[in-house]
Amino acid sequence: MTSEQEEVSILTLQVTFPDPELPPLSLTVSPEESVQEIRNYIRDAFVQERCITSFTLNLNGQPIDGFESLAEIEGLESGATIELTNAPYNEHEARLHVIRVRELAGFSNNSHAAVGQDAGMTAFNRTEGIDKTPKDYMQEVVETKAQKEAKAKLKAEQKKAKAAAKAEALAKNEEVSEDEESEPEDDTPMKQSTQVLEENSPMHGFKLEESKSLQELFPDRQNLPAPALLSLHLSHWNPPTQAQQLNGELLYLQCATLEGESYQIVAHTNGFYVANSTLGSFDPSPKPLMVKTKAKKQNGGKKGGKKTETEISYVPITTENMHHSLYDLLVSLSDKFAKKIASNYAELNAAGMLSVVPPTNCFLANPWLTKPAGFRRPDMARNQELLSLKNLEGQDDTREWSEDLQSLKELPRETINDRVVRERHLNKTYFDFTEAAVAGAVQVVHGEIQPINPSEPEASHIFLHKGIFYSVGADGSGTYAEIGGDEAARVASAKDLQAVQQLVQFDFPEIASLCTTVVDYQGKRIVCQSPVPGIFRQPENAPPQVKYGSVEGAEEIASEQEFGDAFKPIAAAFRLKTHTVKDANKEHSLHLASDCKGLAGTDGRKYLLDLYRLAPVDIAFLDANPSYPHQLALLRFEAVEAYFRHQVRAEIKKQSLDEDETPKFEVEPFYLNPDAFVLPAPKEDEDAVRAASEFVSNTIIPEHVEAVIAGFGTTPIDGQQLTQSLHGKGIPMRHLASVIAAAKKSDTSKAQFLAELCEQEIAVRSAKHLLRNEMAKKGANPKYVVAHVMNLLLGSTSKVFDTPAGLLAVSDSVNLSVDEAKAAVAAIAKTRFGYDLDTSIFAKRPVQLLRELSGKLGLQFLQKEYEFGAEPFAVADVVNILPVFKTTTFRSKLVEEALEAARNSVNTDKDVALQLLRESIPLAEQVYGSVNPELTKVYNTASYLAYEMDEALLAADLGRRACIMSERCSGIDSVDAILNYLNLSLFEHAIGNYVGALHMIKHAVSVWVTVCGTHLHPDIITSLSNAITMLTTLKRWNESRQWLEKTIVITESVANEKAQAPLRFQLAQTMCHEQQYKEATDELRRALKLFNAHYGEDDQNTKDCAVWLKSLTQAAVSIQRQKLWEQEQGRLARQAPKPTATHQKEAPKKASKKTKGKGKGKDDKGEKLVAELKKKKAGKR
């Protein structure tokens, strides 16, 4: 890139404000950024000072508002001045402004049905030995190549000057003190860590075998600071009449300040002012504005001089002098307002803003244990829907979700700015739909929304609310009667959602899919979808909307050519074969399953729905398990893709053997027929589907288990990670029994652990079905059902809770005994998984089962120590039952491409990779917002790349962000959070913060043991080895040895002898530092034996160990000879004449001078010997 291109790629702009107290804002931006992004930045940059929300931007007197990029604005050059002018409010802008001021004042609203108690909590602020506030990595952390070279040059010059000064001092026979020789004191992380570790070690006294108590698992609630106002909400004088609206009045507000004063405020098109209204009388006319001025008055003092005093005067309010910002008005009314906001921000900044900033595009994680409810501040605005963001964004009954979504999908994507705008709005729209759908589904379950077909059975009820179509996840119409009824209908909704999610990621421009969310709440499943445009407003004689697929089951099939051509790319992406289907009249050639429907919307777009059969039948599983509850067992998309690639590789290999030229063949013959074993199909299609189904059982499962056992795959920690790992390989969870069988073929500890975790997951999923069925029964009170069934499974009592008068009766589950409940779970396990479940697992792993069940059913329990085995749960212990949902989400391809480009440049051009990395982070934050689970992945990937590029400070900063984000979005005890803490320990170690690194490992491992239920997890050895390395670096030889010995014991239990060799080698080196040479020699012999057996004689580790053993043996002989010589010298000395008094006094002086400043004693000898051994090893190499 030339210098001219670099100059054009950056614009420097000045933004001026109408308020002279605000200095101009300097912006350094890219020409690709949009005007809207500049507007958003200004809103965020001045939220604490002024809360500017309604304004226009002008260049040379002309407005430049819009979504166009800066490069498209005529006359805009680097150095230009943009003038910001206040713009009149409308009702929408006024309400948005009030919400921003409320947020700034400290009011929050977490009343959504999916937001549980203590949602989004983090333990990061409670960890020790680490910086809690992430740095500005864009400016402070990342250094340019020139800066690094300049710093290295300066350091080299300083070192050279210091050496010259030392040489000069020695030449003059001047004594150089230890302080002069040592490095100057500093406050670097390494220096701090060393000082702290001399007093205490985080690993000291840590009992690995003991898991965290339930009381310690989640930290105490982090209460937000008190708001800067007593209240700020809509007044009861709302809404303004038509006549008042003509006067410019938009809203009426009521405010109470910390001083105890109450004000009635009018939101006007020109700003905000205090009205003459009171609680009992309405008068929107403005009160005179109280102004404090300074005037000189005659003072009657001794000297008779004049003194300046403050005088209060009242100025009439006009459209010219009213406050444009509500913030400014409140500052003038309350002296404590601005001070309290500044105090709150300082408190939040000290705790880390990332841990408290509210999300805009995601839901936060709900902990399964929560403290008793704390103090709740009164806030009238909580029940005022006018201040709801849902209404602000038009989420009312008339919103056309499908139209909004498809319009966004059709936005241009030619430039980076186009893609950022498109992806940000798509991500936000999908979340807005999910938010509205989950809230509506809860209302449906509570009976608060009337069905549009009330005369039909309850299972057939459908609802239309806020532009969203709701249906019950049951077979109310009999569509699935032949393949499993309600069970099949429930599964079909989940399969449909999976297919829609795949389509969202494929992002086909010509195909319109529906926003879809599936909500499970209190045992009931509600399917939420955006309606196809025009589906409820069809004229009487209009042609049928279904243009492709089944119209009325298999009796009538549609196959219009235009739709078929549009759907063909989708079939290729899903590896589906074009096949022939017969209806009552003729044959049809279909690319997708016959159950899929292509509809023509009234907006002219092609809509694709009913996608639950976009994968072939898992026929091998159904044949082997005839009692399975439904016939809708399909292959996962990952398995279809794996089988396709397997077939293509086999064909390539076959052709390569037959011909020398590059193989050329069509891949479509390797596609699968989705209607095979559903409708009549050719035998070759059925054989291909059966082969793919058997490929899962005979190839994918054994290979995955072997990979885990061999260490090439991760050994899962909990059920969620197990599910993700199996799904990633294309293994459905109904195959858990096959995974257990494959694992039990090996006698290794990894295989045993995998089998036990799979058995735990079978128990959890079977118990989930029992609890779900009991809660869904008519007349059941969910809270009582949960407490009762949990006591049956995790306790030993069938006691029935007394239901208070007025509440509905508990369901029939009260008739179950403990044995009957566990037998019911075992029966479900046999039916659904084909596995004979040992129900004693409920007594062996109660905490783990409670945690997993809570996550799958949305349960929150009171955080306390439960006495499992008796009657652990009371009704009051069930704090909350939350909706559990799966939904369509949009992942940014632009962000993924930026990170991939950075990854590919790491080894070729580090500066380019670093620049790409720096750009990808703000890009991701633009698309996803400040808080989002996708940001966790971005921070995690970016931190690793920075670590590989030796940008340790940047890696540590991003690692801290990943920890906070994963805790808030996935949970404090999630596997993501555990792994991110372990990764962060490496980054903290790289910057020299060993104390912080050890604290990270200690925290992660303690949560790991609690979640896993045992410290004998195969992968925990790596984390302990990292801790040992850190202790060794700090010369904590005794602790290093203790943890090495513990780790070797764990390795003997969960790993093979090969894993012990390097640990024993490291233990021997640690023993040398403690001068325990005999024990070190013994350990070296054991290590060398293991190295020879498992690594081979030619391996470098084997050679190094042999060198150490040989050198240590020789050193031991020398040490023994030295001891014998010293003993002989002592004997001769005792026989010689005694020295004079002078000699007796001089000898200690010489010895003292010799050892002056060393202060190492015994340890110094061990370190010298280790240094000699390392030198010999290097020489051998």
From Swiss-Prot:
Gene Ontology BP terms: intracellular distribution of mitochondria; mitochondrion organization
Entry function: mRNA-binding protein involved in proper cytoplasmic distribution of mitochondria.
Protein's cellular compartments: Cytoplasm
Disordered, as annotated region: 165-195, 1130-1181
One GO CC annotation: cytoplasm
Subunit structure: May associate with the eukaryotic translation initiation factor 3 (eIF-3) complex.
Protein name: Clustered mitochondria protein homolog
Superkingdom of source: Eukaryota
Gene: CLU1
PROSITE patterns the record matches: CLU
UniProt key word Cytoplasm: yes
Compositional bias of kind Acidic residues: 176-187
Principal cellular location given in the protein's record: cytoplasm
Similarity comment: family membership: Belongs to the CLU family.
Lineage of source species: Eukaryota, Fungi, Dikarya, Ascomycota, Saccharomycotina
Basic residues bias spans: 1150-1159
The UniProt record lists the keyword Cytoplasm: yes
